[in-house]
Amino acid sequence: IDLEEVTSNIKIGRMTGLIQGSLKNFTMEYGQPSRFDLVITSDRSRKVPQAISVDAIKNLSIISTGSETISDILNSGLNRFFSQYPYSEIGIRCTLSDDLFSLRGLIREGGKEYLIRRSTFRGIDMVNQNPDNSISFKDMSERMGRLFQPRQQSKDVPSG
């Protein structure tokens, strides 16, 4: 799956690269998903640029943590001059069972669980800070809904 084609049609933010995945044990009840196991990983079958935009990083942060705290990092120091970052690998597993949604990183290095791993010289790692966390599917749906709402502009508050 070409991420650039997919992300050009949804408001998550621009990503380039190829992914592959599987969806297993998918069931619907009362018009909404009730169970699934989704795995998404980088596809290295062709050499294509792998990059993620700042907007996509912010939106994936909302999905994975429920907050935009990564915005502070992206708007500080040298980071504010970049609109996208290279990455080396994507590894994500989402499961839903008994109304509990779980998001896990499949890349494990140095005791950390990564959803997205930075490239060798530059980039931003997306670390799953709370790997054992599960939330209700309703809460995850609300997080997804927040992606399509206008963001409030942060205001610089003078220190005094």
Model feature map: region roles:
Residues 1-160:
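Membrane-proximal interfacial segments on either side of biological membranes
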